[in-house]
Curated annotation (Swiss-Prot):
Domain of life: Eukaryota
GO cellular component: extracellular region
Main function: Has effects on muscle tension.
Tissue expression remark: Found in the nerve cords and a variety of ganglia particularly in the anterior regions.
Assigned keywords, A-Z: Amidation, Neuropeptide, Secreted
Name this polypeptide is given: FMRFamide-like neuropeptide AF2
Gene Ontology BP terms: neuropeptide signaling pathway
Similarity comment: Belongs to the FARP (FMRFamide related peptide) family.
Major site of localization recorded for this protein: secreted
Modified residues (Phenylalanine amide): F7
Species this chain originates from: Panagrellus redivivus (Microworm)
Location within or outside the cell: Secreted
């Protein structure tokens, strides 16, 4: 689960 592109 990646949450680094949370705009």
């Amino acid at each position: 689960k990646h949450e680094y592109l949370r705009f």
